[in-house]
A protein has these predicted regions:
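Ferredoxin-type iron-sulfur electron-transfer modules in oxidoreductases and energy-metabolism complexes
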Residues: 27, 33, 160, 182-183, ...
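Iron-sulfur cluster-binding cysteine motifs and their immediate structural context
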Residues: 11, 18-63
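C-terminal alpha-helix
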Residues: 210-218
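Flanking helices and flexible, charged tails adjoining ferredoxin-like Fe-S electron-transfer domains
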Residues: 46-131
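Fold-independent oxyanion-binding glycine-rich loops
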Residues: 1, 14, 56-58, 98-100, ...
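Cysteine-cluster motifs in flexible loop/terminal segments that predominantly coordinate metals
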Residues: 16-20, 102-103
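Flexible, acidic/Gly-rich N-terminal and inter-domain linker regions that tether
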Residues: 1-10
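Cofactor-cradling patches in redox/metallo enzymes
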Residues: 108-110, 115-118, 124-209
Length: 218
């Protein structure tokens, strides 16, 4: 992994969270630590205060519940992914992507995860065109109003059992668009995700590792 890659942050135990929070464009800092579901990995905090925080090249950023994305000061790694798909899906897992109002960076990285360098299909993971052929929906983008209905219809078209994966900071929290008038995230109040892959955009290796993990392949 490129040493310059901004992966899992190393937040010192003595970090001034209020000071770091004053720099953050997405309000990722709180009294609990740094929320990787909000962080866009811009690196401003690390550039301004390298004595408090730095980003390591560790690309294992995904977790299986939203609250696990909050890293406390002094915490060195994220909890391991414990969720596992049923055995019937551990050798073949089909994903339908819905791009819901994002910038297309996460979509490009998701597509790159299937190229010759990362080859996600070697683990039996396929990205399919029809929701009727899918086992899961992988959501990218903050969910704008114009895509809310299409997202819901796509989800309804996926046969049971089905799973929801949130890929990228925008999908997880709304990212830089959180709270905007054009955003409608009501869908996520009704359906729970089994996997959260942060990043702006999410790196192909983070995507591959995360999905392979819930298949019991990593």
């Amino acid at each position: 992994m490129d040493p310059a890659f901004p992966g899992v942050p190393d937040l010192t135990a003595s970090a001034d969270l209020q000071m770091l929070g004053g720099l953050c464009p997405t309000n990722a800092f709180s009294s609990d630590g740094i929320d990787l579901g909000r962080c866009v990995f811009c690196g401003l905090c690390a550039r301004e205060h390298p004595e408090m925080i730095k980003f390591t090249p560790n690309n294992k950023l995904a977790v299986d519940s939203r609250d696990k994305l909050i890293m406390a000061p002094g915490q060195k790694a994220l909890p391991k992914i414990e969720f596992r798909l049923p055995f019937s899906l551990r050798r073949s897992f089909a994903l339908r992507n819905v791009s819901a109002g994002g910038c297309n960076a996460c979509e490009m990285e998701l597509a790159a995860s299937n190229n010759v360098n990362f080859d996600i299909s070697r683990y039996g993971i396929d990205i399919v065109a029809s929701p009727r052929h899918a086992d899961a929906l992988i959501l990218t983008g903050p969910i704008n109003r114009n895509m809310a209905e299409a997202l819901s219809e796509t989800w309804q078209a996926i046969p049971e059992p089905k799973y929801l994966i949130l890929c990228g900071t925008c999908a997880i929290s709304g990212g830089i668009f959180a709270g905007a008038e054009a955003i409608n995230r009501a869908f996520l109040k009704h359906w729970a995700a089994c996997l959260f892959i942060p990043g702006c955009p999410a790196h192909p290796l983070s995507i591959v590792h995360a999905i392979a993990s819930i298949m019991g392949r990593r």
